[in-house]
Amino acid sequence: MSARTVVILAVLGIALPGPTPIQAQQTPATNPLDAVPDKMPFDIPYGTPISLERAEAAIAATVAEAKKHDWKLNVAVVDSGGNLVAFQRMDGAQLASIQISEHKARTAVTFRRETKVFENAIQQSNFHYVMTLDGVIASRGGIPLVQGGRLIGAIGCSGGTGSQDEVACKVGAATIK
């Protein structure tokens, strides 16, 4: 029986016994969430919380990068427990981005990964369940601060585009070694 005949019979409401050729050709898609990795992803141990001095140095580097491009950003640094250590609002930075910069930093430290990972999960992989996780902001610009293989805090930037926020924050994160 041809596929055209099956479609005509289906439109007329005539049921056929057993699977139709159209049904037989479809195979269920594999769920990428069913994959079991050998190692725990983003398994970065927490370290001693970042000091105020180092947080301010990371912010200074971030602000210097933003100024090169005339980007007006809010920059927040949190410690390994997600507590605010330092913050700077550049002149003219939008007010809504104050909380967003802190949220990006907290997400990066809490989940031990860049916030871009969540953005990619939603936009590129259709992992919409990410939006149900408490405390997640799925927008780039939150970068973990890792020293000696240990997570000591995170930096978050907001006020520009996601890519601008990310570029500036990575400059600040690079001050931590």
PLM regions and their residue ranges:
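Bacterial N-terminal signal peptides
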Residues: V6-G18
